[in-house]
UniProtKB/Swiss-Prot annotation:
The lineage of its organism: Eukaryota, Metazoa, Chordata, Craniata, Vertebrata. This is UPF0538 protein C2orf76 homolog. InterPro entries: UPF0538. It comes from Mus musculus. Transmembrane segments: none annotated. Belongs to the UPF0538 family.
Length: 126
């Protein structure tokens, strides 16, 4: 089977409370790789991106969640929607394609512990 390649936007979320995030576009992403393989790639790539400020490059990202899929409705949340975790949080043992990721999908990359704290008390600092 030929590798399916896609363009994905990964939103690096440093802080939910302060709405501190930065999108990074990746071209030619293989949708048949597992979520775990993509996380490993991101953890290796993000620290090397000199265009990102150090607080975003050197953070403990570990979780991916689908923010928006092309040609579908967007959430009103400014940083990340807190609903539908069962379907939108990507499981490491599945492929990106099996998880619902397609070309032009926007994915959030963040620290799972930060997300749990924010979900329990979703207050913004500004």
């Amino acid at each position: 089977m030929a590798a399916e390649e896609a363009t994905l936007t990964v939103r690096l979320i440093r802080s939910f409370e302060h709405r501190n995030f930065k999108p990074v576009v990746y071209h030619g992403v293989n949708l048949h790789q597992t979520v775990k393989e993509f996380i490993i790639f991101l953890k290796q790539d993000v620290p090397l991106r000199t265009s990102l400020p150090p607080p975003l490059r050197n953070y403990k990202y570990d979780t991916l969640k689908i923010l928006h899929q092309a040609h579908k409705a967007k959430t009103n949340e400014l940083v990340l929607g807190l609903e539908d975790d069962d379907t939108l949080l990507l499981k490491e043992d599945r492929t990106l394609k099996d998880s619902g990721v397609a070309s032009e999908t926007e994915i959030a990359f963040f620290c799972g512990e930060d997300y749990k704290r924010y979900k329990a008390n979703p207050i913004s600092s500004w």
